[in-house]
Amino acid sequence: LKQALGQHVRSSRYLEAVASGDMRCDLDGQPVEAVAPEHVQHAIVEVFRRRQGKDAEKARAWARARFVQAIDASGLDRDAYLERVRTQDATALSLIDEACAELAGQAARREALVRAFRASGKAVEEFAEMYGLDAALVRDALAREQTA
C-alpha cells in the first residue's frame, strides 16, 4: 500500500490535479477540504520542472497561469502567500512574482472597468454592448469590487 500510494502521489496526473487547486476528495469522490496553498505550489513547481524539458516557454506560461489561479484562490497578498508557501527556489519565486504582477494588472483593469461603468450611468447590458464586452465580465468585475 505504501509503495502504491508513493507511486500515485508522484504521478503527473496526481500532481496536475493538485496543481489545479481543486478540492481534496474522499474515497467516495466527495469533496472534503481545500488543498493547502503550499501543496498547490509544490505541485505546480514539480509539474513545471517535468514539462520544462519538452517546451520551456509553454511550461512557463502554464506555471504562471496556475500560480495566478492559486494565488487568487488563496485570497492572500504576495507577502502572505510567500510566507505560507515558504520557498527559496528562485524559479518558483520568479513565477510567483510574475503571477502577482499579472494579478495586479487584472485588478487594475477591473477597477478601471468599474469606474467607467459607474461614470456611464448605463445598465450593465448597455455598458457592455457599448464597449463590446461580455455582460458577464462586467457583472464579475462589479461583484469582485463589492466583496473587496
Language-model segment annotations:
Residues 1-26, 33:
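N-terminal interaction modules that seed assembly of large macromolecular complexes
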Residues 86-109:
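Short, Lys/Arg-enriched anionic-surface-contact patches
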Residues 86-89, 123, 130-131:
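Positively charged, low-complexity, intrinsically disordered RNA-binding extensions
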